[in-house]
């Protein structure tokens, strides 16, 4: 599996972790956030935590004091696992989290981020602080688009899986005049002046949208449009030199506005090949192509996809990043494992909890583990020799994959008759749900 794809999975894990941590709350100031940037000394932070322990011993509230001391102790224990700060820095979260029914649970997490985190932070609060992680996620490459023709201009950005229109405006330029003589010269001057002012306005808008704190805020700029407006803009002295150096592609499009923006993204695909939005469309399109060819080298829905994975037949597994599917592993009365997949909605509808019962004996099975299927896949996909790609529903193809195919499917290495396999969880899951 490529380094880029593995990094994408690490990013997905952090994104999901941030979502979970944001919803965690505690009593008092017993939730610790510790972020250590690359190049720092572990000993410095060990000494700092020792001092913090002494200070926390003076907290008047007994309950809060014990909680804070416990969190500091857990943080120190986590820190001892490292001889030095990892290359990308170190992030530690420790503390007691309030669960449903006002119960508390200790949460201790330590990890190296997927890229350097240049923040030093130590906070005791009633929540975990994830702002620094959120910044890491947001700082994926952004590409600016200017779609310009004789009727309108659109500014947009593509970053990761997202495309966003920043601004659009229309323009009313005079058409070429058919008369001759002085009248023609006058109209030509007027037309050139309005065209010049239009290019100036577009250039000024580019600075407004693509420069922040005197620096370009995009990794590259794509100029798109019909006629020669886009070329004129790129070569004009009116176009900011800082942005001129960021032009990576100029493309001809048949439309203006949103349609032109979408076409420009497609035409610039090779240049933007590292942008997740484009990669995602290509991945899902390959899946759709296999279906169109009726090649037999595809599957979709959780039951068929997981069976194909177990058989080692999956080359590339596609999974909706926010798939609401839980993987339950039970042990039946004979000690054999039973795997069941259910959405939270299906579980809520199952008022009798029939999914907990052995379908042969009716006896309640022993629960071994339960976790989101997406998280299980992120941990185990390599065991089956598969590539794993998380996709969003932000593109048209992604939306179709989620709505029409259940948000999980695969391109297979070879044809496999899935009807010959015995899907243990078929009783509890319908691909149409």
Swiss-Prot record:
Give the superkingdom in one word: Eukaryota
The record's subcellular locations are: Cytoplasm
BP GO terms, sorted? cytoplasmic translational termination
The record's annotation in InterPro entries points to: eFR1_2_sf, eRF1_1_Pelota, eRF1_1_sf, eRF1_2, eRF1_3, Peptide_chain-rel_eRF1/aRF1, Ribosomal_eL30-like_sf
Q: Which interval of the chain is the signal sequence?
A: none
Specify the effect of residue 291 to A: Reduced interaction with sup35/eRF3
The impact of changing residue 400 to A is:
Reduced interaction with sup35/eRF3
Instruction: Please describe, based on the UniProt annotation, the reported consequence of changing residue 300 to A.
Output: Does not affect interaction with sup35/eRF3
Q: Which residues carry this modification: N5-methylglutamine?
A: 182
Would the keyword Nucleotide-binding turn up in this protein's UniProt record?
A: no
Subunit structure, briefly?
A: Component of the eRF1-eRF3-GTP ternary complex, composed of sup45/eRF1, sup35/eRF3 and GTP.
| PANTHER family (UniProt xref) | PEPTIDE CHAIN RELEASE FACTOR SUBUNIT 1 (PTHR10113)
Q: Which NCBIfam families match?
A: aRF1_eRF1
Q: Give the protein name, as stated in the record.
A: Eukaryotic peptide chain release factor subunit 1
What gene is this protein translated from? sup45
């Amino acid at each position: 599996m490529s380094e880029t794809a593995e990094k994408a999975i690490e990013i997905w894990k952090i994104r999901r972790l941030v979502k979970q941590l944001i919803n965690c709350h505690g009593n008092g100031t017993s939730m610790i956030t510790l972020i250590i940037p690359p190049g720092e000394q572990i000993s410095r932070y060990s000494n700092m935590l020792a001092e913090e322990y002494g200070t926390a011993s003076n907290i008047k509230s007994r309950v809060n004091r014990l909680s804070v001391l416990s969190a500091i102790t857990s943080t120190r224990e986590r820190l001892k696992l490292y001889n030095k700060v990892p290359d990308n820095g170190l992030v530690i979260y420790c503390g007691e989290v309030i669960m449903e029914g006002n119960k508390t649970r200790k949460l201790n997490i330590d990890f190296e981020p997927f890229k350097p985190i240049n923040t030093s932070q130590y906070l005791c609060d009633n929540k975990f602080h994830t702002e620094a992680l959120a910044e890491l996620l947001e700082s994926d490459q952004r590409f600016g688009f200017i779609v310009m023709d004789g009727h309108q201009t659109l500014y947009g950005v593509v970053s990761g899986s997202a495309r966003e229109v920043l601004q659009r405006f229309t323009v009313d330029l005079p058409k070429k005049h058919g008369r001759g003589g002085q009248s023609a010269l006058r109209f030509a001057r007027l037309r050139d002046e309005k065209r010049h002012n239009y290019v100036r306005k577009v250039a000024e808008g580019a600075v407004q949208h693509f420069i922040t704190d005197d620096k370009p805020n995009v990794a590259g700029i794509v100029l798109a449009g019909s006629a020669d407006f886009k070329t004129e803009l790129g070569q004009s002295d009116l176009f900011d030199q800082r942005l001129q150096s960021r032009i990576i592609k100029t493309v001809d499009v048949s439309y203006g506005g949103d349609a032109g923006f979408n076409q420009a993204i497609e035409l610039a695909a090779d240049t933007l090949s590292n942008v997740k939005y484009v990669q995602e469309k290509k991945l899902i399109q390959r899946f759709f192509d296999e279906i169109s060819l009726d090649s037999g080298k595809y599957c979709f829905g959780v039951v068929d996809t997981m069976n194909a994975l177990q058989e080692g037949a999956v080359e590339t597994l596609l999974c909706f990043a926010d798939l609401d599917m839980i993987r339950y592993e039970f042990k039946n009365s004979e000690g054999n494992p039973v795997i069941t997949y259910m959405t939270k909605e299906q579980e809520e509808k199952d008022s009798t909890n029939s999914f907990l019962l052995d379908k042969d004996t009716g006896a309640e099975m022993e629960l071994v583990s339960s976790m989101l299927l997406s998280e299980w896949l992120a941990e185990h996909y390599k065991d089956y020799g598969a590539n794993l790609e998380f996709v969003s529903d932000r593109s048209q193809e992604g939306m179709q994959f989620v709505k029409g195919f259940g948000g999980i499917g695969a391109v297979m290495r070879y044809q496999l008759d899935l009807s010959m396999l015995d899907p243990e969880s078929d009783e509890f899951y319908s691909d149409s749900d």
